[in-house]
């Protein structure tokens, strides 16, 4: 069985009857959503908030009841993937382009469970390019200010055209030569740049990480 599938399906066991949950986006969250669809068919009663249009479509296909985050005060649990995670449960997310909605949903949840395969565990964040969501207006000015923090930047494309997020924004992917020693500081500095909507750094948000390894499930 695929390591992502092992982690994703195991995470679904943390979802209990009556919960309001956040559904993540990406190739690992896919397996959690598939498993939850199966459990809903078997009688599990939940309500879910999707973190992307892609996840919304999948949940609807599986008949998972969906709600708006505007209609609830908080969520019991969100299960989502990550592009990198360190030993302090700090994350880089946004490889799939849904980082803003993922962060809004995660910050509205009592618990955030991150599901990954062992290749995503790192000693220091930053090998994976850090996604930053920016508004399209004067985007080159915003990119220039991001570069002034010492990174190399690339405007994200899809099918040779500018990638547009579900929020009609753009994404700049950033590589920092010395990785990211203090993610919380970098996040604050990036957020101070006018035009930056959100960063893919998730700091002090994760409750637990479920890692699919060749030897089975490991929890952080």
From Swiss-Prot:
One Pfam assignment: Rib_5-P_isom_A
InterPro entries in the cross-refs: NagB/RpiA_transferase-like, Ribose-5P_isomerase, Ribose5P_isomerase_typA_subgr, Ribose5P_isomerase_type_A
Keywords: Isomerase
Catalytic activity field: aldehydo-D-ribose 5-phosphate = D-ribulose 5-phosphate
EC id: 5.3.1.6
Transmembrane regions: none
Keyword Cell inner membrane: no
Tree of life domain: Bacteria
Residues the record lists as binding substrate: 25-28, 80-83, 93-96, 120
Pathway of action: Carbohydrate degradation; pentose phosphate pathway; D-ribose 5-phosphate from D-ribulose 5-phosphate (non-oxidative stage): step 1/1
Molecular function in Gene Ontology: ribose-5-phosphate isomerase activity
Catalytic residues in the record: 102 (proton acceptor)
Keyword presence, Isomerase: yes
Gene Ontology biological process terms from the UniProt entry: pentose-phosphate shunt, non-oxidative branch
HAMAP family, sorted: Rib_5P_isom_A
Subunit structure: Homodimer.
Functional note: Catalyzes the reversible conversion of ribose-5-phosphate to ribulose 5-phosphate.
Family statement: Belongs to the ribose 5-phosphate isomerase family.
Protein name: Ribose-5-phosphate isomerase A
Native species: Bacillus cereus (strain ZK / E33L)
């Amino acid at each position: 069985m695929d390591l992502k599938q092992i982690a994703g399906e195991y995470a679904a066991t943390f979802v209990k009857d009556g919960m309001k949950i956040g559904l993540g986006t990406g190739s690992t969250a896919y397996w959690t959503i598939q498993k939850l669809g199966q459990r809903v068919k078997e009688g599990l009663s939940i309500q879910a908030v999707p973190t992307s249009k892609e996840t919304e479509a999948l949940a609807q296909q599986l008949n998972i009841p969906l709600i708006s985050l505007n209609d609830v005060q908080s969520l019991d649990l969100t299960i989502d993937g990550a592009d990198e995670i360190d030993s302090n449960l700090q994350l880089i997310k946004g490889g799939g382009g849904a980082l803003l909605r993922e962060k809004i949903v995660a910050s509205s949840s009592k618990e955030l469970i991150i599901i990954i395969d062992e290749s995503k565990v790192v000693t220091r964040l930053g090998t994976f390019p850090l996604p930053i969501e920016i508004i399209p207006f004067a985007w080159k000015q915003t990119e220039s200010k991001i570069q002034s923090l010492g990174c190399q930047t690339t405007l994200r494309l899809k099918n040779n055209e500018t990638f547009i997020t579900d929020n009609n924004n753009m994404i700049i992917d950033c590589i920092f030569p010395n990785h990211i020693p203090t993610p919380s500081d970098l996040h604050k500095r990036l957020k101070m740049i006018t035009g930056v909507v959100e960063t893919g750094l998730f700091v002090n948000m994760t409750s637990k990480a479920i890692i699919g390894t060749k030897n089975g499930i490991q929890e952080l």
